[in-house]
Amino acid sequence: MGPFPHNAPKSVISDENPAGTDGFEFVEFAHPEPQELRDLFAKMGFDLVARHKVKPLVELWQQGDVTYVLNADPDSFADKFVAEHGPCAPAMGWRVVDAQKAYEHAVSKGAEPYDADDKTMDVPAIKGIGGSLIYFIDQYYDTSPYNQEFEWIKESKPRGEGFYYLDHLTHNVYTGNMDKWFEFYGDLFNFREIRFFDIQGKFTGLFSRALTSPCGRIRIPINEDRGETGQIVSYLKKYKGEGIQHIAVGSEDIYASTDAIAENGLKFMPGPNPAYYEMSKDRVTDHEEPLDRMMKHGILIDGEGVLDGGETRILLQIFSKTVIGPIFFEFIQRKGDDGFGEGNFQALFESIEREQIESGEISAA
């Protein structure tokens, strides 16, 4: 199993990894009411650690090795993205061996370059999902990539509530576009498919292809609706386009981390019924996870469990409600399992479906 996103070895440029990808560096968010993002990030355990030296409304919020960029600059690409999408994720940054070489490689393979002056950082960028941006950030083994452009106001990478790496983020795309975006990541960066899912709820369904970068640190499932009225369609209407559906961050103690962010006021999607937990050992062999703590907030469990040789393969996960427009967050702990919680997809899908039916976004007819 593995390597997992949080412990994959450092990258080098190679035939297998031609762009030299090395992981997620940041996700950028923007909102018509930026204070809502500040309040949300604080609930999830993030600290405001730096401000841009010449664009003070661009902020860095960190926890462990996870960085969220809050962009409230009125002259930015992000501001234009907000005008089109409302609360949104207008960009993500990838850590790479050499930013300029990664950019040149991507453009040579057909990527659309983005060189306007309204970028968040003065680094190479291309157009990505739904017109959002992908920034390329040099690895910077011994120093921070933010030192040149940001003024630190706190120590970087605070522990927060224990979330220490960005595990994956998921895209929602228009029906028929899943293969297009698979080819985008495959042709430009040599991503490969590691999972395929076909999920059917009571009223709606979706297909999903989970992709991983050659470095193993960037994982992006791509979701496409099975019909014309499902939850992916609902997202696309609300977001006014394709984009990031959710961001997953990892903890070494999901129970303590979840207790903390719940106490901070973060709300979670409704958990499954008690039978799910009572039957969990039938599905996840010989696990010894505390059912009472799982049920407290609705933590889900997946994986093969404890194998004959004593090896553990368990994934624990829980999901927030939608908190940035239609975007939500996932909180996970990996105990030897490198999947996406396939055994819980049905429960998650139906939980989202219930939420959208109750809000009137989709019909139960």
Where in this protein do the model-derived segments appear?
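An N-terminus-focused feature that recognizes amino-terminal "leader" regions
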Residues: 1-152, 168, 175, 179, ...
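TerminUS-proximal long segments
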Residues: 2-11, 317, 321-365
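Active-site-adjacent structural elements in folded domains
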Residues: 10-12, 226-234
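Surface-exposed interaction/gating patches
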Residues: 21-32, 152-219, 228-229, 238-274, ...
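Conserved active-site tyrosine of GNAT-family acetyltransferases
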Residues: 37-42, 106, 184-186, 261, ...
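A generic beta-sheet turn/junction motif
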Residues: 54, 63, 215, 322-324
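Flexible loop/turn segments at secondary-structure boundaries
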Residues: 56-58, 77-78, 143, 201-203, ...
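Intrinsic, low-complexity N-terminal interaction/targeting segments
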Residues: 69-71, 76, 125, 136-155, ...
